[in-house]
Amino acid sequence: LKLASQIEKINTMHELYPKRLIEVDLPIKRISEHAQNEKNLRSGHPWHLHIWWARRPWGACRAVALASFLPAPTDERCPESFIVKASAILSVFGLSPNGATREQLQDSLLKFVGEYACWELGANATFRDAARQLVQAAYPEHTPTAFDPFAGYGAIPGEAARLGCDSIASDLNPVALLCLQTLLVAVPKNGQELLDRFREGADFVRFEAEKRLGAYYPKHKGKHPIAWLWARTVTCEGPGCGAEIPLIAQEVIDRAETKAWIKISGDKKTKDVQIHVKQGMAIPAGLIKTAGGGHAVCPIPECGFTTHKTRVKVQGMAGKMGNRLYGVVLAVGQRQGKEYSDTNDEDIAAYTRAAVAWERVRKNNSSADITEKYPYHDPRAFTAGNYGIRTWGDLFSPRQKLALWTLGEILRDYHAQLLKDGASESLARDTITALALSVSNTVPFQNNMAWYSRGMNYCYKGMGMSMKWDYGEANPLVSDYAGGIHFAFHQAEEAIRATLAINNSSTSVMRANAAELPLPDDSADMFFSDPPYYDVVPYADLSDLCYVWLKRFIGHLHPDLLNEMLTPKAEQILVNPYSMADGRGEQSPERYRERMTQAFREGRRVLKPDGIGCIVFAHKGTGAWETLLASIIDAGFIVTASWPIDTERAARMRANKSA
């Protein structure tokens, strides 16, 4: 009865209030162009503080939010006061001449919305002030409130705040919440002081890291390594062979002007397999791979046996899969190129020293062992589980664990230094959190699922994490390369600068289940969200890679967020056919629809009768769309418009197959 009453109230209000601009038109071509350009940005954007998945372009969210707040001038119920004010505001841009008709004003508003989707214009004071004035003209009696119960990385609440609104962001994931609190609360609250402390802290961490870890990351023939090249190994099961096969799936590692490749050879008598890294102007013919389709091919010519993928899995599950260090990538000058080389005795000795040092750390610190469970029950998105990976700790070598653990110790030392120097508890916590997120942003490169091809690539593939036969180990101390703390701190500093340009501190961040929001009835003017994508993005599992380190870095500063073994799974709204085997409860399509309906119904409860809901959904499957629309309608919303916006850059993974 309550839902029926709400729906009746919605229908009545829908007839009384003017349509919003987004309900009659939207400059989708211009918004899409800006969105694709924004996706190509490599620095100077809030999302470079830390990795997150399925992120929406902030400029597109800004444009959609603005078009949702503003009434459509061509609607006869649009207030005359808005017509007058909007015309005056847009006259600054030459978009609305005196005496313009309502149709002309609407066209001018659409042009403004389309241009304001440009990421760079978000920091332009003239555009920002005009957008805020337009929102104020649409809401002359109060500051509108927008809320996003699936806030993720914060594009929607961040851009609502940029428009001058009271913005509310909530999520369940602690990694997302740390990003939200840092970008949308700590940065605007502390301003330049946080940026200054962050820069000082980055210098402190870099200096201490070099001092404490430098011996484990030595130069190679006088040059700084960017990365080391590794291959997993299995035993050839060919008759009478038994050679140790290094699994090389990528025989060419750099196709740039100075090319690099791998030459593999084997000796019949000794059963020894040699790997050499070569470099030159032309890639020779006849290079071989030893891994393909999950199978292992023996490179000894007299053998050539293919160990079937099922047997490779058996060896992995039995703990018989090894790792072999075979190459090193060197920095030449200031980004003047790269040099590729075989490893030498010192490379191997340094790694061995790190392994011994890590063993000492592990014995002296009960929390050093990373025993948290890897999602091995999901062979679809996390294929390493098929090869014996059982904990998140299995994804890190001893040297990588030592480096990350040491960086955490340095962060704790800097926290103590901040307090000693007179910083407030709040500022010290916010600064260390931003630094910890920066270090955490190297974790996707600092594991044995990351791979090297012209440069370090992180471990995630699509929306999962696939097994890597040959992988790269990034040098965390080297300057200006992905996987290192220098690059991570630079990216984070630029992200903080970009967030400062939002120039609004009225964002509230809370941890909440989208189906049970701690917000009063009829309290928000806009419900704008990007809900979970049915069966595509396992956010919680993906974020656990960083979570296990963040809780070791700053768990003492955020005991409310970082007090569980792993990120919460049972309450996430997702379709996962393997959830029952993993003990996290049913996550079927039927359950997804039920819980999504609950979330939308809760959104409807919080939304004012004259409020507007806006849902972003980027799934390519019709079944997922049908389920989402059914949930929206079941929750009592009236669907008045739908717009296709292309937010993906053409070069992204799977772009040619996505809707």
Where are these regions (language model features)?
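Class I SAM-dependent methyltransferase "Motif I" SAM/SAH-binding loop
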Residues: 150-154
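A short glycine-rich, Lys/Arg-flanked "PGG" loop and its adjoining helix->strand segment in the class I
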Residues: 593-609, 634
